[in-house]
Amino acid sequence: MKFSIGGSLKLAFRPWVEGLENIPAEGPAILASNHLSFSDSFFLPAVLDRKVTFIAKAEYFTSPGVKGKLTAAFFKGVGQLPVDRSGARGAGEAAIKSGIEVIERGELFGIYPEGTRSPDGRLYRGKPGGLARVALATGAPVIPVAMIDTEKIQPPGKVVPKLMRPGIRIGKPLDFSRYQGMDGDRFILRSVTDEVMYEIMKLSGQEYVDIYATAAKRQIAEAEKAAKDAAKAADKVADKASDKDGKGAE
């Protein structure tokens, strides 16, 4: 099913790819990508000859009804692996465990170091827990990947994607085997993550923001709420002024 889905995506969207030769023909590797759109996890597997496994929310595989079954079949078809994210710490450990298992099978494991989609198209600080821990626990090479323009195809909240060409740039493998077994050292984890994010930034050309994307989303939500509250307050003041003017005219 993966190949039929991948073939359909390539035919419809005609994604362009650079650096495909950096994906090994065999053996394990970690593909670390920026995350602009829900569709990122579909376009990258579509252009690869090998299966790549990404982590996905368990809800995508357990939703009821016909739509739920179709969604589950689609996610399985493109190589998604369900992980329960209901508990933050437990979810993180489950994702790391799943990633290590994929690598130990000699396969490709895909991960988004930012931990969530970018809220504004910029590249945010990578979280050191997932990517670096899997890399240092296994010694697998890390291949930086940049998704290009996927946020224009399917922005957050948009169900029907826009037909246009996305791009995918694949960088040269990064070797962190010198740190293998040091996945308990938080300074090493931070250093490895930052190096990977720097390579992704060079490939994508994105502006880098040294805060987590989750924090940026909170700031944006708070700013939007403050703007709405201010607008409501202004409307109330205007209504009161209008009422006074009306009474004065009487």
Predicted regions and their residues:
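Residues at the C-termini of beta-strands that transition into short coil/loop
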Residues: 21, 58, 84, 146, ...
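Short gly/ser/thr-rich secondary-structure transition/capping motifs
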Residues: 10-17, 90-93, 151-152
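Structured helix-beta-strand junction loops
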Residues: 11, 26, 51, 77-78, ...
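A generic local structural motif
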Residues: 15-20, 40-41, 68, 96-98, ...
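A transmembrane-helix-recognition feature enriched in membrane-embedded lipid enzymes
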Residues: 1-18, 50, 67-78
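Non-catalytic C-terminal accessory region of glycerolipid acyltransferases
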Residues: 93-250
